[in-house]
Amino acid sequence: MTTVSKQKSNLLEQFNETRTRTLSLVQTLEKDDFIVQTATFMSPPKWHLGHVSWLLEVVMSKTVSNYEFYSQEFSEYLNSYYHQFGEPHDKDKRGLATRPTVDQIFEYFHMITNKATNILQNELLDEKTQQLFFMAINHECQHQELLVYDLQHLLADRYRPLVRNSLPAPSQQESSSIKINGGLYMMGYSGDQFCYDIELPEHKVYLDDYKIDSFPVTNKQYMKFVEDGGYDDFKYWLSDGWDKIRNENWKTPMYWKKIDGQWMTCDFLGNRKVNPNEPVCHVSYYEADAYCKWAGKRLPTEAEWEKAACWDEKNQRKTIFPWGNESPDPIHANLLESYLWNCSEIGAYPNGKSHYGCHQMIGDVWEWTSTEFSGYPKFKTGFSEYNDKWFANQKVLRGGSFGTPSISIRGSYRNFFRLDERWLFSGFRCAEYI
């Protein structure tokens, strides 16, 4: 089998797995659940189902001569932000539209699946076309994760996943600070599989010596910041962050409440006590930065984060993942296919630690870095309006979360969000100058 044929076979396999997983995430929902938008930052489940199918139509329109979109009405509703295809529907009004109906969206989903499958099975696809379909698959994986965020906000423990596995055994690990030697580091994706344009090209960066924590910051550590009055002291906060927490009355991470003197949270496991040994989750960049200042530390740059995650000092090589080049599985990290629906305690994945000894750099929580999101030197866009239009007012996060599909994460993967967003599964780890 030729390399191109192998890639096409892998493409079809990933496509089938991804479409199946999307349906599995919504299989237990009631029809009424599909249309609700509980906040302006989330989207109704039916919109996610339709949008990932519409993006497949976008790809097919770029690869099939004289392609006609299924419906102008559908395109207008399902277009997120692609002005080249018309005026996008307002995000904060996605829950106000009763048409297309839920049944129509499901019919559309299956029709587009069949149409794309026919192309993937029967057409001769050049490398550029295959990369576009890989992009569409990875785009759907991104929306699977966004859907998981939204399902937690919508339903919490009333969501009944098809599969729920037991969390790993509790750990008694304590975080330590690991020294990383500086020097030149080749940053970016170095593999031969799909990656996004923003992970390329590989390029040299210079790093000074630094320290980085072996674990993400835990709930126990973050509680001390909260209880020490961290949210009430302006000296820890960026100006915009200080305005944000006062205007929104933020006093804790999202979902935390103090009831009868006990810190509680509400998530897929229900209303429960905050587990002190889990990574803190649902914090914004502002909160992560403020904590680091309070602790006398700082957030790592994304280059520092990537080197700590992927550089093998002993063998002088870079690996795709912290543990090596093997694809992720539940032994290495807590990702979507682990189906735990929650963060694991720190130290739960010794087989997934980096060559330097940093744990849980893949999975559990996305980790904020101090780096502004922009293109690497000599960046070339791979798909207009997909990533490069966001090169302003965003910070880079690394590592994935328990909602991230395993095929869409690696040590070089760059996520990005605005500094005030925190409904995602976001945490952080601290770094220090030496």
Where are these regions (language model features)?
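Polar low-complexity intrinsically disordered regions
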Residues: 1-6, 118-121, 165-169, 247
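Functional-site microenvironments in short loops/helix caps that host divalent-cation chemistry
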Residues: 132, 136, 140-142, 146, ...
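Disulfide-stabilized, aromatic/cysteine-rich ligand-recognition loop
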Residues: 2-43, 47-54, 58-115, 119, ...
